[in-house]
Amino acid sequence: YLVLQEIKQPSIKWFDRNQKFIKEDLIPDSVTRSNYHSLRGLSCPFNLLGDKIYFHTDLMPTIYEVSPNTSPKAIYKFELGRYSPELYKLKDYEKKDESPYILIADSKISDNFVFGEYCYQKYFYRVLFDKNSCKKWIIPTNMELMDIRNNHSKVGIKNDLDGGFDFWPRRVSKNGEIYTWYNVEDLRKKVQQSVSKQMKNPEATKRLKEMLNGLPEDVKVIVAVLKEK
């Protein structure tokens, strides 16, 4: 997770998310030897996969791909689809237009998956997309919204995502499982903050911390499977 910032043409300097300069010997030769002319003046989060750069800007629901000496092309787009009301409100059904605006908070590209996090109507959602099977899983990051006792929805999560009915775990997966992902760096920070607070389950926090500390350095994302009780 870096910030790409070009200082002088055609030189590109590399910084981490804290604006700390990264030495060129830490950047792959295939990148440092290329100009990436089309990215001049751009400063935004991006992923590097092989010799391709994937990036998004804050105000566009689109992930772009750019190769050395080529212009960016749209490769993935976050679309919410059309809204359908809950089952118990079908008699009041009214179609709504597709949402023209969502905010991508984070995106990561791997060989087999696209990981995304976006904000829509003040709620954050995570997307796990399988590039091979084209299957996707979408869940809110605030798990309190998945409590059917919550007033947010009488039957589950308000589905502004793909035009289907509201859903609770039984409508996300036939087996009552929900898939999500976590940024390892952010999760470490949250665990560290939790250690200093009084936790309801300190033993679980301890196990999570030990698991994170045992991860290889090149692991950036954790995929989690949540099982409905």
What are these regions (language model features)?
Residues Y1-E6, S11-K13, C44-E65, Y101-R126, ...:
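Short beta-strand elements that form the blades of beta-propeller/WD-repeat-like
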Residues F15-K20, V66-T70, D130-S133, K229:
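Short loop/turn segments that connect beta-strands within beta-propeller blades
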Residues Q19-G41, K73-E98, W137-G163:
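Surface-exposed loop and turn segments in beta-propeller and other repeat-based domains
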Residues S34-Y36, E65-S67, P85-E86, R126-V127, ...:
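A short, polar/proline- and glycine-enriched secondary-structure boundary/capping micro-motif
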Residues L59, T70-P72:
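Charge-rich, low-complexity N-terminal segments
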Residues Y83, Q121, E185, E228-K229:
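Generic structural motif
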Residues Y123-N151, K189-K206:
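C-terminal/domain-terminus segments
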Residues K190-E228:
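C-terminal functional modules
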